Protein backbone atom coordinates (compact mmCIF):
# COMPACT_ATOMS: atom_id res chain seq x y z
CA UNK A 1 0.00 0.00 0.00
CA UNK A 2 1.42 3.40 -1.04
CA UNK A 3 1.57 6.49 1.17
CA UNK A 4 -0.70 9.44 0.34
CA UNK A 5 0.70 12.96 0.42
CA UNK A 6 -0.54 16.46 1.21
CA UNK A 7 1.35 19.44 -0.21
CA UNK A 8 0.82 23.20 -0.23
CA UNK A 9 0.65 24.71 -3.72
CA UNK A 10 1.05 28.39 -2.87
CA UNK A 11 3.46 30.25 -0.53
CA UNK A 12 2.62 28.24 2.56
CA UNK A 13 -0.09 28.88 5.17
CA UNK A 14 -2.67 27.27 2.88
CA UNK A 15 -4.50 25.45 5.64
CA UNK A 16 -2.73 22.09 5.39
CA UNK A 17 -3.09 21.56 9.13
CA UNK A 18 -6.88 21.39 8.97
CA UNK A 19 -6.89 18.94 6.06
CA UNK A 20 -4.21 16.73 7.61
CA UNK A 21 -6.17 16.78 10.85
CA UNK A 22 -9.37 15.92 8.97
CA UNK A 23 -7.82 13.13 6.93
CA UNK A 24 -5.58 11.87 9.73
CA UNK A 25 -8.63 10.22 11.24
CA UNK A 26 -8.44 7.83 8.26
CA UNK A 27 -4.69 7.16 8.61
CA UNK A 28 -2.71 5.50 11.38
CA UNK A 29 0.69 6.96 10.45
CA UNK A 30 1.33 10.65 9.68
CA UNK A 31 4.81 11.84 8.60
CA UNK A 32 6.48 15.23 8.31
CA UNK A 33 9.32 15.25 5.77
CA UNK A 34 10.96 18.71 5.57
CA UNK A 35 11.25 22.15 7.12
CA UNK A 36 11.54 23.05 10.76
CA UNK A 37 9.73 25.08 13.38
CA UNK A 38 9.45 27.96 10.91
CA UNK A 39 6.31 26.22 9.66
CA UNK A 40 3.09 26.48 11.60
CA UNK A 41 -0.18 24.58 11.51
CA UNK A 42 -3.19 25.95 13.33
CA UNK A 43 -5.95 23.44 14.00
CA UNK A 44 -9.33 24.17 15.57
CA UNK A 45 -11.19 21.24 17.10
CA UNK A 46 -14.37 21.77 19.11
CA UNK A 47 -13.49 25.44 19.49
CA UNK A 48 -9.98 24.76 20.86
CA UNK A 49 -7.03 26.15 18.89
CA UNK A 50 -3.79 24.14 18.76
CA UNK A 51 -0.63 25.43 17.05
CA UNK A 52 1.88 22.87 15.78
CA UNK A 53 5.30 23.59 14.31
CA UNK A 54 7.22 20.31 14.29
CA UNK A 55 4.89 17.55 15.44
CA UNK A 56 2.71 16.23 12.59
CA UNK A 57 -0.97 17.17 12.67
CA UNK A 58 -1.95 13.54 13.14
CA UNK A 59 -1.07 13.91 16.81
CA UNK A 60 -4.71 14.78 17.46
CA UNK A 61 -5.69 11.27 16.39
CA UNK A 62 -5.01 9.13 19.50
CA UNK A 63 -4.52 6.05 17.33
CA UNK A 64 -1.96 7.56 14.93
CA UNK A 65 1.83 7.27 15.00
CA UNK A 66 3.48 10.58 14.08
CA UNK A 67 6.90 10.64 12.44
CA UNK A 68 9.38 13.50 12.13
CA UNK A 69 11.52 12.45 9.17
CA UNK A 70 15.19 12.84 8.37
CA UNK A 71 14.50 15.81 6.08
CA UNK A 72 13.26 17.92 8.99
CA UNK A 73 15.62 20.19 10.92
CA UNK A 74 14.69 19.94 14.59
CA UNK A 75 15.07 22.58 17.26
CA UNK A 76 15.11 20.48 20.45
CA UNK A 77 14.06 23.51 22.50
CA UNK A 78 11.05 24.16 20.26
CA UNK A 79 10.12 20.48 20.12
CA UNK A 80 10.21 20.11 23.91
CA UNK A 81 7.92 23.10 24.29
CA UNK A 82 5.51 21.68 21.73
CA UNK A 83 5.50 18.27 23.39
CA UNK A 84 4.33 19.87 26.63
CA UNK A 85 0.89 20.40 25.06
CA UNK A 86 0.24 16.66 25.15
CA UNK A 87 -0.07 14.32 28.12
CA UNK A 88 1.47 11.14 26.74
CA UNK A 89 3.35 10.73 23.47
CA UNK A 90 4.78 7.25 24.12
CA UNK A 91 4.29 5.16 21.00
CA UNK A 92 2.70 8.12 19.20
CA UNK A 93 5.79 10.13 18.23
CA UNK A 94 8.92 8.92 16.43
CA UNK A 95 11.88 11.07 15.38
CA UNK A 96 14.39 10.08 12.71
CA UNK A 97 17.90 9.56 14.03
CA UNK A 98 19.10 11.30 10.85
CA UNK A 99 17.18 14.55 11.37
CA UNK A 100 19.56 17.48 11.84
CA UNK A 101 19.57 19.65 14.95
CA UNK A 102 18.99 23.39 15.23
CA UNK A 103 20.82 25.09 18.07
CA UNK A 104 20.57 28.63 19.40
CA UNK A 105 23.61 29.69 17.38
CA UNK A 106 21.77 28.78 14.16
CA UNK A 107 19.02 31.23 15.11
CA UNK A 108 21.59 33.92 15.91
CA UNK A 109 23.30 33.40 12.54
CA UNK A 110 19.92 33.63 10.79
CA UNK A 111 19.01 36.93 12.42
CA UNK A 112 22.49 38.42 12.00
CA UNK A 113 22.57 37.65 8.27
CA UNK A 114 19.10 39.14 7.79
CA UNK A 115 20.30 42.35 9.46
CA UNK A 116 23.32 42.49 7.18
CA UNK A 117 21.13 42.08 4.08
CA UNK A 118 19.29 45.27 4.97
CA UNK A 119 16.68 46.14 2.35
CA UNK A 120 17.53 42.92 0.50
CA UNK A 121 16.51 40.75 3.46
CA UNK A 122 14.77 37.51 2.49
CA UNK A 123 12.26 37.80 5.31
CA UNK A 124 13.14 34.60 7.15
CA UNK A 125 11.46 33.70 10.43
CA UNK A 126 14.83 33.96 12.21
CA UNK A 127 14.41 30.41 13.53
CA UNK A 128 17.75 29.12 12.24
CA UNK A 129 16.33 26.93 9.48
CA UNK A 130 18.61 28.14 6.70
CA UNK A 131 21.84 27.99 8.74
CA UNK A 132 20.97 24.47 9.95
CA UNK A 133 20.39 23.26 6.39
CA UNK A 134 23.57 25.07 5.35
CA UNK A 135 25.55 23.16 7.98
CA UNK A 136 23.91 19.94 6.82
CA UNK A 137 24.91 20.48 3.19
CA UNK A 138 28.43 21.60 4.12
CA UNK A 139 28.79 18.40 6.20
CA UNK A 140 29.29 20.13 9.54
CA UNK A 141 25.83 19.62 10.99
CA UNK A 142 24.81 17.44 13.93
CA UNK A 143 22.07 14.80 13.82
CA UNK A 144 19.62 14.00 16.56
CA UNK A 145 20.83 10.40 16.78
CA UNK A 146 24.16 11.74 18.01
CA UNK A 147 22.49 12.65 21.30
CA UNK A 148 23.02 9.06 22.42
CA UNK A 149 26.73 9.88 22.93
CA UNK A 150 26.90 13.21 24.72
CA UNK A 151 30.69 13.24 25.11
CA UNK A 152 31.32 12.84 21.39
CA UNK A 153 28.61 15.31 20.35
CA UNK A 154 29.81 17.85 22.90
CA UNK A 155 33.34 17.68 21.50
CA UNK A 156 32.12 17.92 17.89
CA UNK A 157 30.15 21.09 18.64
CA UNK A 158 33.13 22.67 20.42
CA UNK A 159 35.29 21.80 17.41
CA UNK A 160 32.63 23.39 15.18
CA UNK A 161 32.83 26.58 17.24
CA UNK A 162 36.61 26.65 16.93
CA UNK A 163 36.53 26.04 13.16
CA UNK A 164 34.00 28.83 12.64
CA UNK A 165 35.36 31.18 15.30
CA UNK A 166 36.24 34.04 12.95
CA UNK A 167 32.85 33.80 11.22
CA UNK A 168 30.98 33.85 14.52
CA UNK A 169 32.97 36.81 15.80
CA UNK A 170 32.31 38.75 12.59
CA UNK A 171 28.57 38.25 13.11
CA UNK A 172 28.80 39.19 16.79
CA UNK A 173 27.69 35.77 18.01
CA UNK A 174 28.94 34.47 21.35
CA UNK A 175 29.47 30.81 22.28
CA UNK A 176 27.77 29.14 25.24
CA UNK A 177 30.06 27.92 27.99
CA UNK A 178 31.19 24.29 27.78
CA UNK A 179 29.20 23.48 30.91
CA UNK A 180 26.03 25.17 29.63
CA UNK A 181 26.30 23.26 26.37
CA UNK A 182 26.76 19.92 28.11
CA UNK A 183 23.76 20.52 30.39
CA UNK A 184 21.65 21.47 27.39
CA UNK A 185 22.63 18.31 25.51
CA UNK A 186 21.96 16.13 28.55
CA UNK A 187 18.45 17.55 28.85
CA UNK A 188 17.74 16.87 25.19
CA UNK A 189 19.14 13.36 25.47
CA UNK A 190 16.99 12.55 28.49
CA UNK A 191 13.70 13.71 26.96
CA UNK A 192 14.10 13.07 23.23
CA UNK A 193 16.16 9.90 22.82
CA UNK A 194 13.27 7.58 23.81
CA UNK A 195 11.51 8.79 20.64
CA UNK A 196 14.50 8.51 18.27
CA UNK A 197 14.56 5.56 15.85
CA UNK A 198 15.47 4.67 12.28
CA UNK A 199 12.19 5.93 10.82
CA UNK A 200 13.11 4.92 7.27
CA UNK A 201 13.28 1.23 8.13
CA UNK A 202 10.16 1.63 10.23
CA UNK A 203 8.27 2.98 7.20
CA UNK A 204 9.71 0.33 4.87
CA UNK A 205 8.41 -2.39 7.18
CA UNK A 206 4.95 -0.80 7.26
CA UNK A 207 4.83 -0.45 3.48
CA UNK A 208 5.97 -4.03 2.97
CA UNK A 209 3.30 -5.36 5.30
CA UNK A 210 0.71 -3.23 3.52
CA UNK A 211 -1.47 -2.88 6.60
CA UNK A 212 -0.83 0.73 7.65
CA UNK A 213 -2.47 3.76 6.06
CA UNK A 214 0.28 6.38 5.78
CA UNK A 215 -0.13 10.12 5.21
CA UNK A 216 2.82 12.38 4.34
CA UNK A 217 2.57 16.02 5.40
CA UNK A 218 4.53 18.81 3.74
CA UNK A 219 5.38 22.16 5.32
CA UNK A 220 5.38 25.61 3.71
CA UNK A 221 4.34 25.58 0.03
CA UNK A 222 5.51 24.85 -3.50
CA UNK A 223 6.36 28.47 -4.30
CA UNK A 224 8.87 28.42 -1.43
CA UNK A 225 10.72 25.35 -2.70
CA UNK A 226 14.50 25.86 -2.77
CA UNK A 227 14.69 24.74 -6.43
CA UNK A 228 11.28 25.45 -7.90
CA UNK A 229 10.08 28.44 -5.88
CA UNK A 230 10.67 32.19 -6.18
CA UNK A 231 14.42 31.96 -5.50
CA UNK A 232 16.13 33.47 -3.53
CA UNK A 233 12.98 34.32 -1.57
CA UNK A 234 12.38 30.71 -0.61
CA UNK A 235 12.89 28.32 2.26
CA UNK A 236 15.92 26.02 2.49
CA UNK A 237 14.30 22.68 1.71
CA UNK A 238 12.37 20.94 -1.06
CA UNK A 239 8.75 21.63 -0.21
CA UNK A 240 7.31 19.83 -3.24
CA UNK A 241 5.99 16.27 -3.19
CA UNK A 242 9.32 14.85 -4.38
CA UNK A 243 10.87 16.10 -1.13
CA UNK A 244 8.99 13.36 0.70
CA UNK A 245 11.19 10.74 -0.91
CA UNK A 246 14.48 12.22 0.29
CA UNK A 247 12.96 13.56 3.51
CA UNK A 248 11.69 10.15 4.63
CA UNK A 249 13.80 7.67 2.66
CA UNK A 250 10.97 6.51 0.41
CA UNK A 251 11.05 5.49 -3.24
CA UNK A 252 8.86 7.31 -5.81
CA UNK A 253 6.76 4.17 -6.17
CA UNK A 254 5.91 4.44 -2.45
CA UNK A 255 3.90 7.63 -3.09
CA UNK A 256 0.20 7.15 -3.78
CA UNK A 257 -2.40 9.91 -4.05
CA UNK A 258 -1.17 13.53 -3.94
CA UNK A 259 -3.56 16.16 -2.59
CA UNK A 260 -2.69 19.82 -3.19
CA UNK A 261 -3.83 22.47 -0.72
CA UNK A 262 -4.64 26.05 -1.74
CA UNK A 263 -6.48 28.97 -0.23
CA UNK A 264 -9.36 30.50 -2.20
CA UNK A 265 -7.10 33.56 -2.41
CA UNK A 266 -3.32 33.98 -1.93
CA UNK A 267 -1.04 35.04 0.91
CA UNK A 268 2.68 35.34 1.42
CA UNK A 269 4.90 36.02 4.44
CA UNK A 270 8.23 37.75 3.95
CA UNK A 271 9.75 39.33 0.89
CA UNK A 272 9.75 38.21 -2.72
CA UNK A 273 7.54 38.41 -5.81
CA UNK A 274 3.80 38.03 -5.33
CA UNK A 275 1.99 38.85 -8.62
CA UNK A 276 -1.57 39.03 -7.29
CA UNK A 277 -0.80 40.99 -4.12
CA UNK A 278 -3.42 43.63 -3.37
CA UNK A 279 -2.12 46.57 -1.34
CA UNK A 280 -5.47 48.32 -1.30
CA UNK A 281 -8.75 47.90 0.55
CA UNK A 282 -9.41 44.40 -0.78
CA UNK A 283 -6.03 43.13 0.42
CA UNK A 284 -6.58 44.61 3.87
CA UNK A 285 -10.07 43.11 4.00
CA UNK A 286 -8.70 39.67 3.10
CA UNK A 287 -6.14 40.00 5.89
CA UNK A 288 -8.76 40.96 8.47
CA UNK A 289 -11.44 38.46 7.45
CA UNK A 290 -8.87 35.69 7.06
CA UNK A 291 -6.98 36.55 10.27
CA UNK A 292 -3.83 36.46 8.17
CA UNK A 293 -1.05 36.66 10.71
CA UNK A 294 1.77 34.10 10.85
CA UNK A 295 1.36 31.15 13.23
CA UNK A 296 5.10 31.16 13.90
CA UNK A 297 6.01 34.86 13.80
CA UNK A 298 2.75 36.74 14.20
CA UNK A 299 3.71 38.85 11.17
CA UNK A 300 0.86 40.16 9.00
CA UNK A 301 0.68 38.19 5.78
CA UNK A 302 0.64 39.85 2.39
CA UNK A 303 -2.72 39.14 0.75
CA UNK A 304 -4.05 39.00 -2.79
CA UNK A 305 -6.23 37.17 -5.27
CA UNK A 306 -6.03 33.54 -6.36
CA UNK A 307 -3.17 32.96 -8.82
CA UNK A 308 -4.28 30.21 -11.20
CA UNK A 309 -1.02 30.33 -13.18
CA UNK A 310 1.06 29.57 -10.09
CA UNK A 311 -1.47 26.98 -8.88
CA UNK A 312 -1.47 25.14 -12.22
CA UNK A 313 2.34 25.08 -12.17
CA UNK A 314 2.35 23.78 -8.61
CA UNK A 315 -0.25 21.13 -9.36
CA UNK A 316 1.82 19.84 -12.26
CA UNK A 317 5.17 19.80 -10.46
CA UNK A 318 3.64 17.94 -7.50
CA UNK A 319 1.56 15.58 -9.61
CA UNK A 320 -1.62 16.54 -7.73
CA UNK A 321 -4.47 14.10 -8.19
CA UNK A 322 -6.93 16.43 -6.50
CA UNK A 323 -7.10 19.69 -4.61
CA UNK A 324 -8.50 21.09 -1.37
CA UNK A 325 -9.65 24.72 -1.55
CA UNK A 326 -9.38 26.39 1.85
CA UNK A 327 -10.92 29.44 3.52
CA UNK A 328 -13.65 29.99 0.95
CA UNK A 329 -15.60 31.76 3.70
CA UNK A 330 -13.01 34.56 3.82
CA UNK A 331 -14.41 35.75 0.48
CA UNK A 332 -17.89 36.15 1.97
CA UNK A 333 -19.37 39.56 1.24
CA UNK A 334 -16.99 40.60 -1.55
CA UNK A 335 -18.95 42.17 -4.41
CA UNK A 336 -16.34 41.12 -6.98
CA UNK A 337 -13.68 38.40 -6.73
CA UNK A 338 -10.65 38.12 -9.01
CA UNK A 339 -8.56 35.23 -10.30
CA UNK A 340 -5.30 35.67 -12.22
CA UNK A 341 -5.74 33.46 -15.29
CA UNK A 342 -2.65 34.68 -17.18
CA UNK A 343 0.39 36.92 -16.81
CA UNK A 344 1.57 39.80 -18.94
CA UNK A 345 5.30 39.16 -19.46
CA UNK A 346 7.59 41.16 -21.74
CA UNK A 347 4.58 42.43 -23.66
CA UNK A 348 2.98 39.01 -24.17
CA UNK A 349 0.18 37.12 -22.44
CA UNK A 350 1.41 33.82 -20.96
CA UNK A 351 -0.23 31.07 -18.90
CA UNK A 352 2.95 29.49 -17.51
CA UNK A 353 5.45 30.18 -14.73
CA UNK A 354 8.69 32.11 -15.32
CA UNK A 355 11.80 32.26 -13.15
CA UNK A 356 11.71 36.06 -12.85
CA UNK A 357 8.21 36.33 -11.43
CA UNK A 358 8.82 39.90 -10.27
CA UNK A 359 8.53 40.96 -13.93
CA UNK A 360 4.99 39.73 -14.58
CA UNK A 361 1.65 41.47 -14.21
CA UNK A 362 -1.52 39.48 -13.49
CA UNK A 363 -4.35 39.36 -15.99
CA UNK A 364 -7.59 38.86 -14.09
CA UNK A 365 -10.91 37.19 -14.61
CA UNK A 366 -13.62 38.75 -12.46
CA UNK A 367 -16.42 36.86 -10.71
CA UNK A 368 -19.58 37.91 -8.94
CA UNK A 369 -19.35 37.46 -5.18
CA UNK A 370 -21.76 35.89 -2.70
CA UNK A 371 -23.17 36.68 0.72
CA UNK A 372 -22.17 33.78 2.95
CA UNK A 373 -20.71 30.27 2.75
CA UNK A 374 -19.36 30.06 6.31
CA UNK A 375 -20.21 26.73 7.94
CA UNK A 376 -21.78 25.16 4.84
CA UNK A 377 -21.03 21.43 4.64
CA UNK A 378 -22.58 20.27 1.35
CA UNK A 379 -22.02 21.24 -2.28
CA UNK A 380 -25.73 21.66 -2.99
CA UNK A 381 -26.03 24.33 -0.29
CA UNK A 382 -23.31 26.57 -1.74
CA UNK A 383 -24.44 29.79 -3.48
CA UNK A 384 -24.40 29.54 -7.28
CA UNK A 385 -21.67 32.18 -7.59
CA UNK A 386 -19.42 30.25 -5.20
CA UNK A 387 -19.91 27.10 -7.29
CA UNK A 388 -19.04 29.00 -10.46
CA UNK A 389 -15.90 30.36 -8.81
CA UNK A 390 -14.74 26.89 -7.73
CA UNK A 391 -15.51 25.32 -11.11
CA UNK A 392 -13.60 28.09 -12.90
CA UNK A 393 -10.53 27.46 -10.74
CA UNK A 394 -10.77 23.73 -11.45
CA UNK A 395 -10.74 24.42 -15.17
CA UNK A 396 -7.85 26.86 -14.97
CA UNK A 397 -5.57 24.64 -12.87
CA UNK A 398 -6.71 21.41 -14.56
CA UNK A 399 -7.18 19.67 -11.21
CA UNK A 400 -10.35 18.50 -9.47
CA UNK A 401 -11.25 20.28 -6.24
CA UNK A 402 -12.45 17.49 -3.96
CA UNK A 403 -12.49 19.31 -0.60
CA UNK A 404 -13.74 22.80 0.23
CA UNK A 405 -13.24 24.42 3.63
CA UNK A 406 -15.87 26.90 4.83
CA UNK A 407 -14.52 27.67 8.32
CA UNK A 408 -11.51 26.79 10.51
CA UNK A 409 -13.49 24.04 12.23
CA UNK A 410 -12.74 20.49 11.12
CA UNK A 411 -16.41 19.67 10.51
CA UNK A 412 -17.06 22.61 8.18
CA UNK A 413 -15.69 20.90 5.08
CA UNK A 414 -17.44 19.97 1.84
CA UNK A 415 -16.44 16.66 0.27
CA UNK A 416 -17.17 16.25 -3.45
UniProtKB/Swiss-Prot annotation:
One Gene Ontology MF term: adenylosuccinate synthase activity
Keywords of the record: Cytoplasm, GTP-binding, Ligase, Magnesium, Metal-binding, Nucleotide-binding, Purine biosynthesis
Magnesium is among the record's keywords: yes
The protein's required cofactors: Mg(2+)
Catalytic activity: IMP + L-aspartate + GTP = N(6)-(1,2-dicarboxyethyl)-AMP + GDP + phosphate + 2 H(+)
Active site: 13, 41
Signal peptide feature range: none
Cofactor binding, note field: Binds 1 Mg(2+) ion per subunit.
Main localization, broad class: cytoplasm
Root EC class: ligase
Full protein name: Adenylosuccinate synthetase
GO-annotated cellular components: cytoplasm
Entries under SMART domains matching the protein: Adenylsucc_synt
Biological function: Plays an important role in the de novo pathway of purine nucleotide biosynthesis. Catalyzes the first committed step in the biosynthesis of AMP from IMP.
GO biological process: 'de novo' AMP biosynthetic process; IMP metabolic process
Binding site for substrate: 295-301
EC number from the UniProt entry: 6.3.4.4
Binding positions for Mg(2+) per the UniProt entry: 13, 40
Location relative to the cell: Cytoplasm
Positions bound to GTP: 12-18, 40-42, 301, 327-329, 405-407
Residues binding IMP: 13-16, 38-41, 125, 139, 220, 235, 299
Amino acid sequence: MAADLIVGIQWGDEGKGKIVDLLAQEYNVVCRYQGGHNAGHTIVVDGKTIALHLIPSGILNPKAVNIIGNGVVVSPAALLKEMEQFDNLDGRLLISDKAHLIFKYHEEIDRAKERLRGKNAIGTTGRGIGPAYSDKVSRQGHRIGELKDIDTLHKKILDYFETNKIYFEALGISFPSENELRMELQRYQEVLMPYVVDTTNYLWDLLELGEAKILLEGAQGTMLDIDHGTYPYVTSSNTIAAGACTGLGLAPKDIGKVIGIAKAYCTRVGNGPFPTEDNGEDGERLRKQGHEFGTTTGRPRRCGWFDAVAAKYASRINGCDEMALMKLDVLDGFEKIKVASKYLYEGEEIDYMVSDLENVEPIYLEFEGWDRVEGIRSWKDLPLNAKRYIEAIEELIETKISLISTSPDRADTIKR
